[in-house]
């Protein structure tokens, strides 16, 4: 029996009882919520062209060279494919997490209590188009869907869980849906889901502030990561057709270009590719594009649209990636936007319009709700570019890219960075949605 709209509205409205707070909630409030909110672990079995499960694990703030020199990182790389040309997209941490699921930084240049409007889509919306189960696992999250700014270690009171390292909780399209919130869980839920064979097909995994190297160092973080991932590499359920990305949010030296050490692992990698390296240019946006290409999903119409696709996927779909000349590439800051606090970019009240036309690198067009939201508008940026740039703020305008040919070498006639004329400055904010309308929409979607 389908529940009534009234029942669904009541269920959806539970999210408002979990008030987002810009400081750490009291322990009593946390314990009260933890006693009543249960994790939700949907499962699915949608076959992809290169993998059937994708998990990514993020560590923090380490320069590429320092990670590459660590013995545990060397061991991890020997088990899979080392990505030698993978870049974060800005500084500091939070905008990279934001970009990894939403395809844009929206000018974010800070680790504040940022909230992205409910009509801005995420990778969760892409996965939902084919009912592909997704989830997050945040170490020491006190309960599913916790929206507080942080949660300290209750014994030592050191930093533990922090909101800025939780990508989907930044988006109101997730936090205003109680079911989606319950898919944001902790490591205890990961162990339960693993044991019960209820892991999702897509997951984002964040260790706590000690294990992710943020408050420690690469030696500590790499040792933790190897000890955590090594047993999973011997778990047949976990490994079967699984692709794992081990990466970092950003490098540790803000004056550098923001290249980060990244490794692909898992049963989806052919034996002959283990211990090899891939020199293709990638960013955090490439991960969204690769997930879309693998499962035949649409694009968000943002920087995921033109992003290079992981070669392990591109070789299956036939997509030809770009070679990007990184000589003049600077991904250590971002362009103006509504999430800027004036730290590494300039504030602008204008929410960028998404792209609504084109196949994108994944080859499956744009998400329908994005096309509806931004109908009859021009994209603010040239989101079909394999790297982010903005002519208005002179951001990465000297970077060039050339399509590879089928053998992976350059074509004889090189192409420069995509036309600046596509980078239109359009003053249009993200359309607003009333709370009642949003709740009704969520309810009707569940019917």
Swiss-Prot record:
The keyword Acyltransferase does not apply. Has both phosphomonoesterase and phosphodiesterase activity. Cleaves a broad range of phosphate esters. Residues 420-447 form a propeptide. It catalyses: a phosphate monoester + H2O = an alcohol + phosphate. PANTHER family: ACID PHOSPHATASE PHOA (AFU_ORTHOLOGUE AFUA_1G03570), NON-SPECIFIC PHOSPHOLIPASE C4-RELATED. It is a lipid-anchor; GPI-anchor. It comes from Aspergillus fumigatus (strain ATCC MYA-4609 / CBS 101355 / FGSC A1100 / Af293) (Neosartorya fumigata). GO terms for molecular function: acid phosphatase activity. Residues 1-17 form the signal peptide. It comes from the Eukaryota. It is found in: Cell membrane. Optimum pH is 4-6. Active from pH 3 to 7. One of its GO terms (biological process) is cell wall organization. Glycans are attached at residues 119, 150, 177, 186, 208, 217, 234, 240, 315, 332, 382, 405. The gene is phoA. Transmembrane segments: none annotated. This is Acid phosphatase.
């Amino acid at each position: 029996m389908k529940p009534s709209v009234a029942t669904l509205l009541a269920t959806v409205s539970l999210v408002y009882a979990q008030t987002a707070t810009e400081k750490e909630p009291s322990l009593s409030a946390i314990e009260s919520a933890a006693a009543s909110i249960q994790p939700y672990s949907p499962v699915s079995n949608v076959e992809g062209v290169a993998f059937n499960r994708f998990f990514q694990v993020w560590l923090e703030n380490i320069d590429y060279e320092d990670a590459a020199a660590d013995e545990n990182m060397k061991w991890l790389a020997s088990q899979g494919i080392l990505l030698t040309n993978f870049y974060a997209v800005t500084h500091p941490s939070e905008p990279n997490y934001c970009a990894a699921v939403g395809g844009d930084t929206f000018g974010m240049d800070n680790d504040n209590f940022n909230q992205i409007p409910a009509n801005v889509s995420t990778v969760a919306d892409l996965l939902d188009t084919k009912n592909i189960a997704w989830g997050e696992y945040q170490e020491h999250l006190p309960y599913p869907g916790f929206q507080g700014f942080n949660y300290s270690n209750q014994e030592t009171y050191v930093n533990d869980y922090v909101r800025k390292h939780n990508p989907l909780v930044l988006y109101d399209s997730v936090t205003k849906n109680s079911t989606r919130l319950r898919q944001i869980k902790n490591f205890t839920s990961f162990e339960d889901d693993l044991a019960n064979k209820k892991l999702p097909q897509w997951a984002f995994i964040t260790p706590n502030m000690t294990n992710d190297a943020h408050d420690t160092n690469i030696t500590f973080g790499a040792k933790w990561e190897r000890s955590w991932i090594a047993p999973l590499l011997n778990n047949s359920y976990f490994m079967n057709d699984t692709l794992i990305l081990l990466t970092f949010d950003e490098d540790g030296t803000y004056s550098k270009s923001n290249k980060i050490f990244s490794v692909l692992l898992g049963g989806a990698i052919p034996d002959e590719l283990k211990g090899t390296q891939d020199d293709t240019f990638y960013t955090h946006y490439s991960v969204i594009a690769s997930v879309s290409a693998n499962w035949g999903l649409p694009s968000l119409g943002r920087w995921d649209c033109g992003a290079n696709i992981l070669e392990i996927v591109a070789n299956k779909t036939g997509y030809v990636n770009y070679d990007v000349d990184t000589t003049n590439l600077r991904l250590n800051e971002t362009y103006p936007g509504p999430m800027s606090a004036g730290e590494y970019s300039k504030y602008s009240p204008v929410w960028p319009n998404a792209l609504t036309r084109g196949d994108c690198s994944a080859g499956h067009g744009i998400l329908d709700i994005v096309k509806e939201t931004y109908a009859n508008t021009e994209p603010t940026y040239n989101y079909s570019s394999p790297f982010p740039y903005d002519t208005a703020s002179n951001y990465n305008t000297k970077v060039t890219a050339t399509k590879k040919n089928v053998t992976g070498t350059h074509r004889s006639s090189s192409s420069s960075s995509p036309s600046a004329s596509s980078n239109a400055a359009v003053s249009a904010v993200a359309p607003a949605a009333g709370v009642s309308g949003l709740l009704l929409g969520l309810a009707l979607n569940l019917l």
